[in-house]
UniProtKB/Swiss-Prot annotation:
Catalytic activity: tRNA(Glu) + L-glutamate + ATP = L-glutamyl-tRNA(Glu) + AMP + diphosphate
EC identifiers of the protein: 6.1.1.17
Keyword ATP-binding: yes
Subunit-structure text: Monomer.
UniProt cross-references to InterPro entries, sorted A to Z: aa-tRNA-synth_I_cd-bd, aa-tRNA-synth_I_codon-bd_sub2, aa-tRNA-synth_I_CS, aa_tRNA-synth_I_cd-bd_sf, Glu-tRNA-ligase_bac/mito, Glu/Gln-tRNA-synth, Glu/Gln-tRNA-synth_Ib_cat-dom, GluQ/Sye
Protein name listed in UniProt: Glutamate--tRNA ligase
HAMAP family found in the cross-reference section: Glu_tRNA_synth_type1
EC class: ligase
């Protein structure tokens, strides 16, 4: 049987790191076995859907390199790929289960259900539906329907059954039917509940494997019960439940923690290298056998094995993510870097305004985390209004290196050219004249020309600062040095 996996987000928010991980692992599993990866939109929670939620899922997954074989953007024979287009179908199947006595109409009011829940909590019991409507006679049911009394449809759980599955990540899991409640499968507004719709969709789309977060473990026995009621072959689908992702304090990632950027869009906006995020996310709970860290998408597919997914919490380490991004910026080609800088919203206007911006940016290519940092570094290094720091002046004075600055200034004034090569020649001449080398040569020149004690390649930095700015800085510091 062909491997078919799916990622089925709800458009109630934007693509989260956790969702990106789920999508990536399902994608890798499918591609590792020449299978298909499907994106299905579960949009039945109408009140919570947000504008742009669907586009966020697709756009940022594609930004990470994850493209679906089938979806609303690439529909094939297993559609519709969005649940809101299948509402009548779900309703018909729910009513069919009622006709088969596998499900029943529930006319209980919200007040009655709330009272039952409050009583259970008071008695320290797990709230369960009391089956008030399970055995209503046909006459009562028809009278309620004729009176347009509001109802839901509930599945009748077999309390004597054991709902078990061999989890791909956690091994065998069993939940007794007695621990479950009769779940609502169709709401009063005729919209299918999540657990009902997802079972139907997975079956009809011939999904073979479902990898998802551990919060769905509690949904699985209900989905197995629904599948049994619908006479679906339970052997045709395998479930695997991923570990949680925790922050630096060991707490589960919370979208309410605004101090930690958790949405893929945050990293795209800041100008991270896209595959760095994909690479980082891949290792949130997966350990390749060869312990390789830097991997292309092709290498991820080649190495992926569901048996190497961990059930232990995955640590979201922002420093590790930044490390990945720096590694990629360091390793990509100059042409790739230039194209990225030219086209990214953060930098494309700067490229148009400053013809030397690309050249300046290239000085930092091997060291940056993202383009947001790049902009700050370029501005910091090439800001013509930068202030001279007292500690830098003292460094030159205390090490008796004023003569290095003086000679560099004198040589630069008489130099006919001002380009990278001529600047290097001036520095060589200063070395010969002052007998200084290493830090005693380069540090005072850097401080005097750039008003900074650190930075990229010195000759290039001086060149892109411009002759006028460099001479102005030299004159200023020489006055201070006396």
């Amino acid at each position: 049987m062909k491997i078919r996996t799916r990622y089925a987000p709800s458009p109630t928010g934007y693509l989260h790191i956790g969702g990106a991980r789920t999508a990536l692992f399902n994608y890798l599993l499918a591609k590792a076995y020449d299978g298909d990866f499907i994106i299905r939109i579960e949009d039945t929670d109408v009140e919570r859907n947000v504008e742009g939620g669907i586009d966020s899922q697709f756009n940022f997954l594609e930004w990470m390199g994850i493209v679906a074989d089938e979806s609303i953007r690439n529909p094939k024979t297993f559609g519709p790929y969005i649940q809101s287009q299948k509402l009548k179908h779900y309703e018909a199947l729910a009513l069919d289960l009622v006709a088969q006595k596998k499900a029943y109409f529930c006319f209980c009011s919200k007040e009655r259900l709330d009272a039952d829940r409050e009583l259970a909590e008071k008695l320290h019991e797990t709230p369960k539906y009391k089956r008030h409507c399970l055995n209503l006679n046909e006459q009562t049911i028809q009278a309620n329907l004729l009176a347009n009394k509001e109802y839901t449809i509930r599945l009748k759980i077999d309390e004597n059954n054991e709902y078990s599955w061999d989890d791909l990540i956690r091994g065998k899991i069993s939940i007794p039917g007695s621990a479950l409640t009769d779940p609502v499968i169709l709401k009063s507004n005729k919209i299918a509940m999540y657990n009902f719709a997802v079972v139907i969709d997975d079956y009809e789309m011939q999904i073979s494997h479902v990898i998802r977060g551990e919060e769905h473990i509690s949904n699985t026995p209900y989905q197995l019960a629904i599948a049994q009621a619908l006479n679906y072959d339970l052997s045709k689908i395998k479930y695997g439940h991923l570990s949680i992702i925790v922050d630096e304090t060991g707490k589960k990632l919370s979208k309410r923690n605004l101090a930690l950027k958790q949405f893929v869009s945050d990293y795209e906006k800041d100008g991270y290298w896209p595959h760095a995020i994909t690479n980082f996310v891949a290792l949130l709970g997966w350990s390749p056998k060869n312990n390789q860290e830097i991997m292309s998408l092709v290498e991820m597919v080649e190495n992926f094995d569901v048996n190497n997914l961990s059930k232990s919490p995955a640590f979201f380490d922002i420093n590790k993510m930044n490390w990945f991004s720096t590694q990629y910026f360091n390793n990509i080609s100059q042409d790739e870097f230039i194209d990225f800088v030219k086209t990214h919203p953060l930098t494309k206007e700067l490229v148009l305004k400053d013809t030397t911006f690309i050249d300046k940016a290239l000085l930092f290519k091997s060291h940056i985390v993202n383009l947001k940092q790049l902009i700050n570094l370029v501005d910091e290094q090439f800001n013509s209004n930068k202030q001279l720091l007292e500690e830098d002046v003292n460094h030159i004075k205390n090490n008796q290196l004023t003569n290095v600055v003086q000679v560099f200034y004198e040589q630069l004034i008489v130099s006919e050219k001002f380009d990278e090569q001529s600047i290097k020649e001036v520095i060589k001449q200063v070395q010969k004249t002052t007998n200084n080398k290493g830090a005693n040569l380069y540090m005072p020149i850097r401080i005097a020309t750039t008003f900074s004690s650190h930075g990229p390649e010195l000759a290039k930095t001086i060149y892109y600062l411009g002759r006028e700015n460099v001479l102005k800085n030299l004159q200023s510091i020489l006055k201070v040095l006396g």
